[in-house]
Amino acid sequence: MEDIKDSKVKRFCSKNILIILGFTSILAVIALIAVGLTQNKPLPENVKYGIVLDAGSSHTNLYIYKWPAEKENDTGVVQQLEECQVKGPGISKYAQKTDEIGAYLAECMELSTELIPTSKHHQTPVYLGATAGMRLLRMESEQSADEVLAAVSTSLKSYPFDFQGAKIITGQEEGAYGWITINYLLGRFTQEQSWLSLISDSQKQETFGALDLGGASTQITFVPQNSTIESPENSLQFRLYGEDYTVYTHSFLCYGKDQALWQKLAKDIQVSSGGVLKDPCFNPGYEKVVNVSELYGTPCTKRFEKKLPFDQFRIQGTGDYEQCHQSILELFNNSHCPYSQCAFNGVFLPPLHGSFGAFSAFYFVMDFFKKVAKNSVISQEKMTEITKNFCSKSWEETKTSYPSVKEKYLSEYCFSGAYILSLLQGYNFTDSSWEQIHFMGKIKDSNAGWTLGYMLNLTNMIPAEQPLSPPLPHSTYIGLMVLFSLLLVAVAITGLFIYSKPSYFWKEAV
């Protein structure tokens, strides 16, 4: 009788334990489903596109960007889909032939219509930003600049995209957008999170400074460390992803690579004789004829303009780096500084801080000299040595050594190498701080430059506050999923064991 009673009690208890285990299993399953659904809400795929045309002084580039619509407030999600270089010079050269601008832009715009799905055409914004070449044209003739922009707008409006305007951006904007681009792509606007807890350990990351060198201007932009920006016109305030940034930026018009060369020629031709300029910034044996009207055809050379007894002059290269370097330094006025410290031409420059990303012509010139040196890392001292050796080579030997490089670019590499060294010296970079410069062509398959930052700003894709993140940090989410899964497995094994061998369970329990 006792045995029967005992057996009933055990069966009753086993049944209750199985019910409890079953209930626990249900709770674990519900928890797994709840965490999974909360963390991974199903979202329809929705890709957006944007087009930016960089109308520079020497050429125009078109960039197509794409990004997942549901993540457009996250940092680093925009990808460069395509880059198309428009065939021909910069748009400022079309001031007297604006009727040709439509054909000039056609090839790259047609490519855009092919690459972007037809269903997305009407919602794809198109922006054109013109830089220093058009700034110079506007200085010469505001009417001509307006006519060029009007012709550009007419052409771009004829395509099935959402044309948002063509404008001349300021040097300050160009510097700021370049700074935004490289830090966005490098993920420097996000906060670092701890994987140990549910609470984020917010830590503002160091941003990169930006060094941009174009054909007609150069920009330097960075966040100074504990330093007052003494010239208000060089100070910009940003609030990005919940963090405040005080940024120093300045654009030196006429100090882009091409215009700096024109300045140097205009300066040096004044002391030449007989219409021949022996130029240390070109390889020995190199010769070129230059029209005086072309030399003085830019506002950048007006300060050196004087009546010359000839209409043309001949450049004869002598290939002397030291003399070239000295001639370039004469373009930088260091005689007066109204601030605690300056770069050149009396422009305030706070103490350099942190790492810098150098792009555009900085990158292209350095990339060439890295190939010359057969080394991916070049110190300032090594760069000086390589440039000196390159300049001293005869023009014939240089052409033979680099047959794949266009002669126009090859002939100017001696000057370009010396100019970059001189310009960075003007920016107060030393042997040690040179090591903090990273020469960047692309970051994560996107070109380093101002265009992406320009689009991000105009489409409001960089929020002032940190966007809402998933309910749980990724590591915590994984941990909870594993915990509930293990609990579910443990409950299932225990329940199965009790169900199949109840007598063994109770014997062990007793």
Curated annotation (Swiss-Prot):
<feature type="glycosylation site" description="N-linked (GlcNAc...) asparagine">
    <location>
        <position position="428"/>
    </location>
</feature>
<dbReference type="GO" id="GO:0030168">
    <property type="term" value="P:platelet activation"/>
</dbReference>
<feature type="disulfide bond">
    <location>
        <begin position="254"/>
        <end position="300"/>
    </location>
</feature>
<dbReference type="GO" id="GO:0043273">
    <property type="term" value="F:CTPase activity"/>
</dbReference>
<keyword id="KW-0067">ATP-binding</keyword>
<comment type="subunit">
    <text>Homodimer; disulfide-linked.</text>
</comment>
<feature type="transmembrane region" description="Helical">
    <location>
        <begin position="479"/>
        <end position="499"/>
    </location>
</feature>
<feature type="topological domain" description="Cytoplasmic">
    <location>
        <begin position="500"/>
        <end position="510"/>
    </location>
</feature>
<dbReference type="GO" id="GO:0045134">
    <property type="term" value="F:UDP phosphatase activity"/>
</dbReference>
<keyword id="KW-1133">Transmembrane helix</keyword>
<keyword id="KW-0460">Magnesium</keyword>
<dbReference type="Pfam" id="PF01150">
    <property type="entry name" value="GDA1_CD39"/>
</dbReference>
<feature type="disulfide bond">
    <location>
        <begin position="281"/>
        <end position="324"/>
    </location>
</feature>
<comment type="similarity">
    <text>Belongs to the GDA1/CD39 NTPase family.</text>
</comment>
<dbReference type="InterPro" id="IPR000407">
    <property type="entry name" value="GDA1_CD39_NTPase"/>
</dbReference>
<feature type="glycosylation site" description="N-linked (GlcNAc...) asparagine">
    <location>
        <position position="333"/>
    </location>
</feature>
<keyword id="KW-0812">Transmembrane</keyword>
<feature type="topological domain" description="Cytoplasmic">
    <location>
        <begin position="1"/>
        <end position="16"/>
    </location>
</feature>
<feature type="transmembrane region" description="Helical">
    <location>
        <begin position="17"/>
        <end position="37"/>
    </location>
</feature>
<dbReference type="GO" id="GO:0036384">
    <property type="term" value="F:CDP phosphatase activity"/>
</dbReference>
<keyword id="KW-0378">Hydrolase</keyword>
<dbReference type="GO" id="GO:0005524">
    <property type="term" value="F:ATP binding"/>
</dbReference>
<feature type="glycosylation site" description="N-linked (GlcNAc...) asparagine">
    <location>
        <position position="73"/>
    </location>
</feature>
<feature type="disulfide bond">
    <location>
        <begin position="84"/>
        <end position="108"/>
    </location>
</feature>
<dbReference type="GO" id="GO:0009181">
    <property type="term" value="P:purine ribonucleoside diphosphate catabolic process"/>
</dbReference>
<dbReference type="GO" id="GO:0005886">
    <property type="term" value="C:plasma membrane"/>
</dbReference>
<feature type="glycosylation site" description="N-linked (GlcNAc...) asparagine">
    <location>
        <position position="291"/>
    </location>
</feature>
<dbReference type="GO" id="GO:0009897">
    <property type="term" value="C:external side of plasma membrane"/>
</dbReference>
<protein>
    <recommendedName>
        <fullName>Ectonucleoside triphosphate diphosphohydrolase 1</fullName>
        <ecNumber>3.6.1.5</ecNumber>
    </recommendedName>
</protein>
<dbReference type="GO" id="GO:0007186">
    <property type="term" value="P:G protein-coupled receptor signaling pathway"/>
</dbReference>
<dbReference type="GO" id="GO:0016887">
    <property type="term" value="F:ATP hydrolysis activity"/>
</dbReference>
<feature type="disulfide bond">
    <location>
        <begin position="391"/>
        <end position="414"/>
    </location>
</feature>
<dbReference type="GO" id="GO:0003924">
    <property type="term" value="F:GTPase activity"/>
</dbReference>
<dbReference type="GO" id="GO:0103023">
    <property type="term" value="F:ITPase activity"/>
</dbReference>
<dbReference type="GO" id="GO:0017111">
    <property type="term" value="F:ribonucleoside triphosphate phosphatase activity"/>
</dbReference>
<dbReference type="GO" id="GO:0070527">
    <property type="term" value="P:platelet aggregation"/>
</dbReference>
<dbReference type="GO" id="GO:1990003">
    <property type="term" value="F:IDP phosphatase activity"/>
</dbReference>
<feature type="topological domain" description="Extracellular">
    <location>
        <begin position="38"/>
        <end position="478"/>
    </location>
</feature>
<feature type="active site" description="Proton acceptor">
    <location>
        <position position="174"/>
    </location>
</feature>
<comment type="function">
    <text>Catalyzes the hydrolysis of both di- and triphosphate nucleotides (NDPs and NTPs) and hydrolyze NTPs to nucleotide monophosphates (NMPs) in two distinct successive phosphate-releasing steps, with NDPs as intermediates and participates in the regulation of extracellular levels of nucleotides. By hydrolyzing proinflammatory ATP and platelet-activating ADP to AMP, it blocks platelet aggregation and supports blood flow.</text>
</comment>
<keyword id="KW-0106">Calcium</keyword>
<dbReference type="GO" id="GO:0005901">
    <property type="term" value="C:caveola"/>
</dbReference>
